[in-house]
A protein has these predicted regions:
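N-terminal glycine-rich phosphate-binding loop and ensuing alpha1 helix
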Residues: 2-58
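A structural signal for short coil/turn segments at secondary-structure junctions
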Residues: 43-44, 69, 98
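Acidic helix N-cap motif at the loop->helix transition within catalytic regions
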Residues: 59-64
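Conserved donor nucleotide-binding strand/loop of the catalytic core
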Residues: 69-81
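Conserved beta-loop-beta/alpha segment of the NTase-like Rossmann-fold superfamily
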Residues: 82-120
Length: 120
């Protein structure tokens, strides 16, 4: 059974104050979101990891990945206005990916997790 994890990180961190959304706040030299990504990669390196980020955060995330030399394979889907919309967008992205992949059939397991919760 193929496994996927949608990591939803669309928040703006307004309640935290400051200019940096909480998913990008450094924790021991890496953004919180990177710790979450690494946690799921350690759990199952064959699981497909999909980050759901607002479009305007995606260039910043890609820059961070280059800066810290991210080795965890993942894809990015566009976030939505609310968590509900972000999860929906991630599931639609995944459905298209599975539908377009040749030879894939059978059951899949999809987990949805908040990007700012790295301690799973």
């Amino acid at each position: 059974m193929k496994k996927y994890v949608l990591i939803v990180a669309g928040g703006r961190g307004l309640r935290m104050g400051g200019d940096l959304p909480k998913q990008f706040i450094p924790l021991e030299g890496k953004p919180v979101l990177m710790h979450t990504l690494e946690t799921f990669h350690r759990w199952d390196a064959s699981a497909g990891l999909i980050l759901v980020l607002p479009e305007d955060h995606q260039p910043y995330w890609k820059m961070l990945c280059k800066e810290i030399d991210c080795k965890v394979p993942h894809r990015i889907a566009n976030g939505g206005e609310t968590r509900f919309h972000s999860v929906r967008n991630g599931l639609q992205y995944l459905a298209e990916e599975i539908g377009n992949a040749s030879g894939r059939s059978g059951k899949v397991l999809v987990a949805v997790h908040d990007g700012v919760r790295p301690f799973v």
